[in-house]
Amino acid sequence: MSHSASPKPATARRSEALTGEIRIPGDKSISHRSFMFGGLASGETRITGLLEGEDVINTGRAMQAMGAKIRKEGDVWIINGVGNGCLLQPEAALDFGNAGTGARLTMGLVGTYDMKTSFIGDASLSKRPMGRVLNPLREMGVQVEAADGDRMPLTLIGPKTANPITYRVPMASAQVKSAVLLAGLNTPGVTTVIEPVMTRDHTEKMLQGFGADLTVETDKDGVRHIRITGQGKLVGQTIDVPGDPSSTAFPLVAALLVEGSDVTIRNVLMNPTRTGLILTLQEMGADIEVLNARLAGGEDVADLRVRASKLKGVVVPPERAPSMIDEYPVLAIAASFAEGETVMDGLDELRVKESDRLAAVARGLEANGVDCTEGEMSLTVRGRPDGKGLGGGTVATHLDHRIAMSFLVMGLAAEKPVTVDDSNMIATSFPEFMDMMPGLGAKIELSIL
């Protein structure tokens, strides 16, 4: 599904205290995997709390195209899966729209099948490099026909029987790790992924939950060895998807920045590989209270009470990047209102997201009067605690949902309004954002440029 052709600019203005309780839409990583693993498992999978953004729905459609039966009854998604090893060759190309996660994970899932599968996406996704996922698949015997630079549109031609490999992930990427593990599901023998820096581990936890023969060992240097034995049986599960920490970041930072705010966010995923932003904000002096911490479906979940806070600049350790890679844009907004300097380093992954996210953030900050320096892999922001002189600019979002939401948050606390050139694509990850934020008291509206 492509975004509407005509852009919908939006403007955020300085707001009074934000107050209330909200429940964030389901986690995107877990939602993608729920559709995939449910579609692959034998028997019935029932999902509540699924993120119904376009990206996740595209993953569901891809699984339907390969034989899974998916329907919705009330609030519950019900999937009847095909059984591991029994995916069918899709009749047409699988269209992932803007969904990098869905596309890359599905490439792993189907690559080792003896069939031909084509992948297409929107203009933004078609610019993103897929080689990091395709290279290990090539080692397993998959043939690839791709556009220049291993980009989409592309076609995978699977081997008669795939070779199990041992693959050391060359960069901190949960998508690459996951793609290789999923390829291992349909491969005889043991497929091993060696991960020098731990990244989000939903694939491992959820595959174990669905019954895969998967083990994780961490050596004395913190290097993880993940082994999966292929061609085993997966069994349908019941899943309640917790709230997405990456989406939580926007109302959370807004509540910290808008004077007098007091907001409670319910049912947030607190998986330790995803909480880098909360940790960083707490180091900056944020008043974030973790309430009712609990385990749900093997994942850590809690409620967060967030109150307006005076923030101070910090140096964010580069090794924290994998646990908050999607949150740097909104952290840069928080840093714009913090006293002193905030240094963010190790941001090379941001160059290959929906946009060159690092450059997009730096340009947006500059357009709104923020003193910042963009390095090769770093961003330094010198803040203005009172928001004086900030705002007044229009931000080029480059079809990137996180850039759009981050700068709308900025406008809520800046002296002058902030406009983003398009808000259509917010629907890819957080369709409720434009209604939920005004419900707390945020002044955000669609604007006429």
Curated annotation (Swiss-Prot):
The keyword Amino-acid biosynthesis applies. Pfam families: EPSP_synthase. GO terms for cellular component: cytoplasm. It is found in: Cytoplasm. It comes from the Bacteria. GO terms for biological process: amino acid biosynthetic process; aromatic amino acid family biosynthetic process; chorismate biosynthetic process; response to herbicide. PROSITE patterns: EPSP_SYNTHASE_1 (PS00104), EPSP_SYNTHASE_2 (PS00885). Catalyzes the transfer of the enolpyruvyl moiety of phosphoenolpyruvate (PEP) to the 5-hydroxyl of shikimate-3-phosphate (S3P) to produce enolpyruvyl shikimate-3-phosphate and inorganic phosphate. Monomer. This is 3-phosphoshikimate 1-carboxyvinyltransferase. It comes from Pseudomonas sp. (strain PG2982).
